[in-house]
Amino acid sequence: MSPGLDLEQSFSQALEGLGLSAQAARMLWLPFPMLLVLVAAVVGVLVTVWLERKISAAVQQRVGPEYAGALGVLQPLADGLKLLVKEDIIPDRADSILFTLGPVLVVVPVILSWLIVPFGQNLLISDVGVGIFLWISLSSVQPIGLLMSGYASNNKYSLLGGLRAAAQSISYEIPLALAVLAVVMMSNSLSTVDIVNQQTGAGVLSWNIWRQPVGFLIFWICALAECERLPFDLPEAEEELVAGYQTEYSGMKFALFYLGSYINLVLSALLVSILYLGGWGFPIPVEWLASWLGQPIDAPLVQLITGTVGIVMTVLKAYLLVFIAILLRWTTPRVRIDQLLDLGWKFLLPLALVNLLVTAALKLAFPVAFGG
């Protein structure tokens, strides 16, 4: 297996080549990962917002944004700048501290979760051995921020929206975690890198989606519910709750909710790509590519090609899922709150438990195929 590109090592070697010491190069690297995550997350959101507006326009037989840049690609940037300069209003009887802290607690855990997303063998910010556990832990913080925002607004619609958001997030967090646990059981690791490496044996046929079709569907449905996408957008249902927990927010605080929602959608799509669709898996064995180029498998040229293709493969798979999520938003009706909770507790949770038990049995019966 090709070791792939190593961002930290390449960065340090480049700075040391300019005459800096190894310690100085390491110090300069420290803020770079978070900057890289922020840039990647914001660019991902801008692309997703543009895709959503163009796809929704196509579904409704409209043109969509077309004047702000070619094909309207600058429209999301214009919307973001508009929100930046809008007045930030705090209601008179709102709890100003909790009102301000709520959006921060919603968006910060989502951004931190990007640290464990790999785009290649060494193309990730933090290869912690418990990356999946870290992501589940961070995602469990978000309902606190949603409930805090609804409560602090001193508005009945905001409070109901916050309660709905917390109930929905808790209801779907459990089956989602059980679906991921089945994948972890097969790969014998909580590391996202190990999970992708476990899917590289036979190309497309070794993807986890073939061994975990039920887990894949459970994860995707729960991810849409966690992102509050239609048909699961009850916390901000306009006909019932005005804008839910976002009702009293404006300016940059409202933009944080908007940003967090789309960052979470792109993150969920990337995680589905990593857990079930082989991640950065190269379409052909790397040994064949190295042989065709007449280079050793660890040659810089081979690493560059495999790293680039890995990033492209991961992003393409993720945006295919984003496209499906956008289509679902504009083609499916909203469910009722009782239907949403029944789906989570009475259907997905038992199904996820059965899927986990069946995976454990298959792992014992067929250890080679199921990662024994």
UniProtKB/Swiss-Prot annotation:
Keyword Membrane applies: yes
Primary enzyme class: translocase
Substrates-to-products reaction catalysed: a plastoquinone + NADH + (n+1) H(+)(in) = a plastoquinol + NAD(+) + n H(+)(out); a plastoquinone + NADPH + (n+1) H(+)(in) = a plastoquinol + NADP(+) + n H(+)(out)
Keywords: Membrane, NAD, NADP, Plastoquinone, Quinone, Thylakoid, Translocase, Transmembrane, Transmembrane helix
Enzyme Commission number: 7.1.1.-
Subcellular location: Cellular thylakoid membrane
GO molecular function: NADH dehydrogenase activity; oxidoreductase activity, acting on NAD(P)H, quinone or similar compound as acceptor; quinone binding
Membrane topology term: Multi-pass membrane protein
Residue intervals passing through the bilayer: 27-47, 97-117, 128-148, 166-186, 204-224, 266-286, 308-328, 347-367
Gene Ontology terms: cellular component: plasma membrane-derived thylakoid membrane
Gene Ontology BP term (one): photosynthesis, light reaction
Function per UniProt: NDH-1 shuttles electrons from an unknown electron donor, via FMN and iron-sulfur (Fe-S) centers, to quinones in the respiratory and/or the photosynthetic chain. The immediate electron acceptor for the enzyme in this species is believed to be plastoquinone. Couples the redox reaction to proton translocation, and thus conserves the redox energy in a proton gradient.
Protein family: Belongs to the complex I subunit 1 family.
Subunit note: NDH-1 is composed of at least 11 different subunits.
UniProt-recorded name of the protein: NAD(P)H-quinone oxidoreductase subunit 1
Organism: Synechococcus sp. (strain CC9311)
Gene (name only): ndhA
